[in-house]
């Protein structure tokens, strides 16, 4: 008697927002994992993917669809598109509002991954609170949310610290992206200008107090700045330390909610760029997408590096995890997008394993599901441990690259 074995088909993958800077960084790495899924469908309202000379188009073996997604107005059209290509996994690298996509996916068997929470009116962190409080509403499939760098990878670091040292008294996410044009001067940003403008000059500055409690500032993040010397000085020597923007961010919200711990994010770009943005905001009363140019490190070569760290404070110690990437080490993308791509691919690999029950997940909840291991295998992460004594820090451990 012959035993028939059912061959499990590889899921077809669609990436929306496929012509963006982050998608470009993901597609540079995706050929390494091309045999993990079936058909690859790249979708964007722009049609410039085929002209990208840095991508291995032959190995990617993709179908490109030039289309603008309009949700919820054209939900049926969107679902029809997913069915037409037999999509099993949807990776969202767009700036489309998140909730309409999640609502649409309730009516189709598709797994979903995104890098951030997008909302036209309101605060992105409020979506995180709502989704954690109402997980059952979107339990029709696996949903991995906020799996980029900030948020995403950094939350895997926090969970690593919690597993090793326990829940801290507070968590501080810090980032200093010193990128600038290699020649001349331009006011640039290395990732989504639209998202940056929203969180720095439209949403009010905020810090998480633990649980779903939030301390809101009266002003926006571009006008709420904090000296980053106290955070970076223990782990990095700089001639001058920047004053970063205190930005409300999804990684703070999910960590605060899941572990009931205060959390905040302080973000700095090149000091000259920040001063220019502050000046523009004071003059205009707002920032616009036209105030910045995308520094892609391709058409516009860049110098500088993106330094991202998280500090976990305990009564007797401070623990840091940090990654730095230099633009000079990247080909076809910039350091920032290369960092984000690690989170996207970690989330995708976790999804493709297929052993997650249907529900909403944030990256700190994927600790034992392979996510952390992929991150540590894909980027150099340093660990610093400092003892606290008389208000000062004394280093007790430094691991140049953890595994």
Where are these regions (language model features)?
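Conserved Rossmann-fold cofactor-binding substructure of NAD(P)-dependent oxidoreductases
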Residues: 70-83
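Adenosine-phosphate binding glycine-rich loop
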Residues: 132-180, 343, 348
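Rossmann-fold NAD(P)-binding glycine/threonine-rich loop
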Residues: 116-141
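Beta-loop-alpha module in the N-terminal Rossmann-like domain of NAD(P)-dependent dehydrogenases
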Residues: 90-104
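C-terminal catalytic/substrate-binding lobe primarily of soluble NAD(P)-dependent oxidoreductases
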Residues: 2-10, 164-403
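Rossmann-fold cofactor-recognition segment
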Residues: 56-72
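N-terminal Rossmann NAD(P)H-binding glycine-rich loop of SDR-like oxidoreductase domains
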Residues: 13-29
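Helix N-cap at the beta1-alpha1 junction of Rossmann-like dinucleotide-binding domains, i.e.
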Residues: 44-49, 119
